[in-house]
């Protein structure tokens, strides 16, 4: 598959979802140290070939193992150093969820705590309010790069989707909007690329935009 490259005068940010893990395949919550599967390593290699066509200037990765393992072939292909940044990591889940199915009773209970802002990093994981604050920090990090930079960010499905949902929105999504959001999470394949732009000179109140949604790489 040949990826469409759109040249702009904006800052271009390409979010790459990490390669597949066995936890992804089983639809189970994962620990921070989960590695890529053999297919995931192939997806990372293919993503690296696609990313090389973009001539990126900077490479950022979440601090989770599956993201770093995806970023390594990109770094090798582009000759860029990896900047590890925990603010682009996946939604922090409580340890009692590790290995549990996404639709288990424990998961449903956590989702309710998450939405209503109940947060305990040791017991209940990260709340919706906290990850929105983290997205704001992540956006500020990106905005500090040169205005014509081309940045690749290796991240995760929930984080990428929430980043897109809150590009121009600080307040929480409604319950009904979140239901639609959940379906979008499923549709971001491992190794796929999403193109976002930031125009510091834009006259609009929001200087962010989605240029191209999920683009699958060749598997």
Regions found by a protein language model. Give the residues of each.
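Acidic, low-complexity terminal tails and accessory targeting/binding regions
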Residues: 2-10, 84, 90-102, 165-219
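Glycine-rich phosphate-binding loop signature in dinucleotide/nucleotide-binding domains
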Residues: 53-55, 144-149
């Amino acid at each position: 598959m040949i990826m469409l490259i759109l040249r702009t005068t904006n800052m271009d940010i390409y979010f790459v979802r990490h390669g597949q893990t066995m936890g992804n395949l089983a639809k189970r919550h994962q620990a921070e140290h989960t590695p890529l599967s053999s297919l995931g390593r192939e997806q990372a290699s293919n993503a690296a070939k696609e990313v090389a066509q973009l001539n990126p200037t900077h490479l950022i990765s979440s601090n989770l193992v599956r993201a770093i393992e995806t970023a390594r072939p990109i770094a090798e292909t582009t000759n860029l150093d990896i900047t590890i940044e925990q603010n682009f990591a996946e939604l922090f889940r409580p340890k009692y969820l590790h290995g549990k199915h996404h639709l288990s009773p424990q998961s449903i209970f956590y989702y309710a705590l998450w939405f209503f802002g109940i947060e305990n990093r040791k017991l209940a994981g990260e709340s919706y309010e906290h990850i929105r604050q983290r997205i704001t920090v992540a956006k500020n990090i990106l905005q500090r790069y040169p205005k014509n930079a081309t940045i690749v960010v290796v991240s995760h499905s929930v984080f990428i989707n929430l980043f897109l949902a809150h590009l121009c929105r600080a307040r929480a999504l409604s319950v009904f909007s979140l239901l639609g959001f959940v379906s979008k999470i499923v549709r971001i394949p491992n190794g796929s690329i999403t193109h976002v732009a930031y125009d510091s000179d834009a006259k609009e109140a929001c200087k962010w935009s989605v240029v191209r949604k999920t683009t699958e790489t060749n598997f």
